[in-house]
From Swiss-Prot:
This is ATP synthase subunit b. It is a single-pass membrane protein. F-type ATPases have 2 components, F(1) - the catalytic core - and F(0) - the membrane proton channel. F(1) has five subunits: alpha(3), beta(3), gamma(1), delta(1), epsilon(1). F(0) has three main subunits: a(1), b(2) and c(10-14). The alpha and beta chains form an alternating ring which encloses part of the gamma chain. F(1) is attached to F(0) by a central stalk formed by the gamma and epsilon chains, while a peripheral stalk is formed by the delta and b chains. HAMAP family: ATP_synth_b_bprime. The chain crosses the membrane at residues 7-27. It comes from the Bacteria. Its main location: membrane.
Length: 156
């Protein structure tokens, strides 16, 4: 094997080229590659974090929706209970008012009935006395009249 100066020159030039590349070209390339890798890793981490945040937000939204439905059902149930209570109170009040009106009516009827009975008793007593006077054709003294009226009223 024969080494000539061209081969040695090429070897020296290649070594200088490799040293130059290692010193000036390789570090910026490695920095660019590392920076790119870091950005990609950060992007993937951000994407994973965003996916987790999205899942968390969806779970939270689902929970809030369930809570809202439960709350709405509770409100509807309370409203139905209140409605039933109001209807029951209205029925109770109406029944009480009806009973009161019926009692007043019965009391008025009873009072009117008693008044009419008393008037009829007086009229019957007066008619009986008038009939008796006509039959006897004489006038009864006031004491006897009063006594007869009282007896007739008691009998009637």
């Amino acid at each position: 094997m024969n080494f000539n100066a061209t081969l040695i020159g090429q070897t020296v030039a290649f070594i200088i080229f490799v040293w130059f590349c290692m010193k000036f070209v390789w570090p910026p390339l490695m920095n660019a590659i590392e920076e790119r890798q870091k950005r990609i890793a950060d992007g993937l981490a951000d994407a994973d974090r965003a996916v987790k945040d999205l899942e968390l937000a969806q779970a939270k939204a689902t929970d809030q929706l369930k809570e809202a439905k439960v709350t709405a059902n509770e409100i509807i149930e309370q409203a139905n209970k209140r409605k039933a209570q109001i209807v029951e109170e209205a029925k109770t009040e109406a029944n009480a008012e009806r009973a009161k009106i019926i009692a007043q009516g019965k009391a008025e009827i009873e009072a009117e009935r008693n008044r009419v009975k008393e008037d009829l008793r007086k009229q019957v007593a007066t008619l009986a006395i008038m009939g008796a006077e006509k039959i006897l054709e004489r006038s009864i003294d006031p004491a006897a009249h009063s006594d007869i009226v009282n007896k007739l009223v008691a009998e009637i």
